[in-house]
Structure formats: structure tokens, C-alpha cells
A protein has these predicted regions:
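Glycine-rich, Lys/Arg-enriched anion-binding loops that position phosphate/diphosphate groups
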Residues: 133-217
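Di-metal (Zn2+ and/or Mg2+/Mn2+) metal-binding site signature of metallo-dependent hydrolases
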Residues: 16-24
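A broadly used, surface-exposed interaction patch
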Residues: 67-95, 100
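Structural motif
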Residues: 15-16, 61-63, 210-214
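Divalent metal-coordination and catalytic microenvironments
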Residues: 28, 62, 84, 111, ...
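Gly/His-enriched, cation/cofactor- and phosphate-binding structural elements
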Residues: 4-10, 56, 184-293
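N-terminal small/polar loop signature for handling phosphorylated ligands or for N-terminal nucleophile
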Residues: 10-11, 25, 29-31, 35-80, ...
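Short alpha-helices
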Residues: 87-156
Length: 293
């Protein structure tokens, strides 16, 4: 196994391409600053994406590695802590004292509370949690989330919003206003993406699939799930390695169950998986047109 080396004593792994993961990493950076190595990681990671953990202080945020990997790392690292909230990972890591789960909080909120105990979370973290748990209970969450999705899912984006938060209500009001204007455009994109949906068989389940940019995957997936006879919608994202899958179900645990069959996991109604190139071609061989009823 080929892994990268770092001179830093702290390694922070976090869920890549995810605003919740970025928020968790930002919370860690507020504590460790440049003393830590921040490494985004996804379920289709390769060994060369990882750092050698021997003698390091290791944190895994809004993400979990397989149990076999963590059981090796705990013997090599100076310390190891996993903070996650994905149901499939919780089931797989049951009994590991260094793996902490809270299904009622997002990864960003868990990281903030873990690294800054007793300090109220910034609004940007509260908004990230509100969307990640798909609650939308806070005023402005939809608008701010829409604005943030025009930027990369990164620590810098979270930090930029935090600076506006510190600047006061007027500065945040500008971001909310921009987000409100963006929401109409997002809905148009969702409508366009769902209009291209097709049926396909994925691990024995007939699902509705389409492609779209990752920024609107949750909205499109949820829309597909409502249209799908199996109540499952899948967003396919292609790369040179294969296809990433954002899976959504209209209630229940269908998304998570299917994601686990695709090497991933997540929550009951929202999860992610992966297909290599050969598996993706097999999926496409089963594709048929879809016409909404």
C-alpha cells in the first residue's frame, strides 16, 4: 500500500465534495490551523490518496473508513477519532470506542462541538446542518445553501460565509438575497435534469437515473425518487475511475440499502455509492426510456 508522507503531526480526513464535510474540516482548522494536514476523501479513495498515520494524531470527520482500515490505524497512530453520522458506517463500526456517532447532528456540527466544546456554533455551521439533515427549519437555510453551492464545497467557502456572519446582518443579508435569486435557477435545473431521466437496473432494483452537477444532486435525486416506481432516484457522476452515485429514496432505508450494495453508505433516504467502469457499462446496458405518468 503506497501512502503519502507528511511532516505534520495531525491529519484531518474529511468527506470530500460535501459542504458538511467542508464545514467539519473548517471547524477543525479553527482549532489546529496550519499544524494539521487536511485531506478530503471519498468512498472510492485509493491508497495513494491517504497519508501514513504512524505516530500521528488522526481525525476522520463526516466520513468513515472500513473497520479493517481503522483497526490497523489504531495500532499505528498516536490517537484516532472518528466523528460521523452516517447510519451504514455506524452499523459497520459498532463497538469501536474511537468511533463516535450522532444521528441527530451533521458532521460539521459534531466537529464544531468536538473541537470547540462549550462554544455556540456559528450560523454557517447551523445552516449546513439544517440542510444536510434535510430539515430546513432555520430561516434562510435554503437561500444560503443555494448561494454556497455557487462556490466549491471547501473550507474556504465556509470561512467566507463565516466572515460575512461576523460582519453582521447586512453582510449576511446580501448572501441570503443572492441565494434567493439562485433558487429559481436551481429549480429550472432540477426540472431539466429530471426530464432526462431513464430507467435502469442497479443491483437488482429498478431505479430512475439521470445526470446533473453535484450541487443539485440532492434536489434532483429527491425529485426522481418521488417519480420512481421503486421510490429510488440515482444521480450518476462520471470520472475516469467510474461512476459516483448519489442515491435518494422517498422515505425508508432504500437509498442506504442500495448504496451499501454499491460499496458506499449513508443515511436511510440519502446515501452514496460507486461503480467501476465495467459496472457502469452494465448499468447502461439495462437503460430504458422513462415517461412520467
Amino acid at each position: 500500500m503506497t501512502m503519502r508522507e507528511t511532516k505534520k503531526d495531525i491529519i484531518v480526513y474529511y468527506h470530500a465534495d460535501c459542504m458538511d464535510g467542508a464545514g467539519a474540516a473548517w471547524a477543525a482548522r479553527q482549532k489546529f490551523g496550519d499544524a494539521a494536514e487536511y485531506a478530503p476523501v471519498n468512498y472510492n479513495y485509493k491508497s495513494e490518496d491517504l497519508f501514513c498515520v504512524r505516530g500521528k494524531e488522526v481525525y476522520v470527520l463526516d466520513f468513515s473508513f472500513p473497520r479493517t482500515v481503522l483497526e490497523i490505524w489504531i495500532k499505528q497512530a498516536k490517537s484516532l477519532l472518528v466523528l460521523d453520522h452516517h447510519a451504514s458506517a455506524k452499523d459497520n463500526l459498532t463497538g469501536l470506542p474511537y468511533a463516535v456517532f450522532d444521528m441527530n447532528k451533521s458532521g460539521a456540527m459534531m466537529a464544531w462541538e468536538g473541537f470547540h466544546p462549550g462554544t455556540e456554533a456559528p450560523m454557517v455551521i447551523k445552516h449546513i446542518q439544517d440542510r444536510d439533515l434535510w430539515k430546513f427549519e432555520l430561516p434562510g437555510t435554503r437561500e444560503l445553501s443555494a448561494y454556497m453551492r455557487t462556490r466549491s464545497a471547501s473550507m474556504d467557502t465556509v470561512g467566507f460565509v463565516y466572515l460575512n456572519e461576523r460582519a453582521g446582518e447586512k453582510a449576511m443579508g446580501v448572501l441570503y438575497g443572492l441565494g434567493e435569486a439562485i433558487l429559481d435557477h436551481i429549480q429550472a435545473q432540477v426540472t431539466e435534469a429530471t426530464s432526462r431521466a431513464f430507467k435502469a437496473w442497479l443491483r437488482g432494483t429498478e431505479v430512475l437515473c439521470t445526470t446533473c452537477c453535484s450541487d443539485i444532486a440532492s434536489e434532483v435525486g429527491s425529485a426522481l425518487a418521488k417519480l420512481s416506481p421503486s421510490k429510488i432516484g440515482v444521480i450518476v457522476s462520471l470520472s475516469h475511475r467510474g461512476a459516483g452515485l448519489s442515491i435518494r429514496s422517498d422515505g425508508g432505508t432504500g437509498a442506504r440499502d442500495l448504496a451499501e450494495k454499491c460499496g458506499g453508505g449513508g443515511h436511510g433516504p440519502a446515501a452514496g455509492g460507486y461503480l467501476n467502469r465495467e459496472e457502469f457499462f452494465e448499468l447502461m446496458h439495462t437503460a430504458t426510456p422513462f415517461t412520467p405518468a
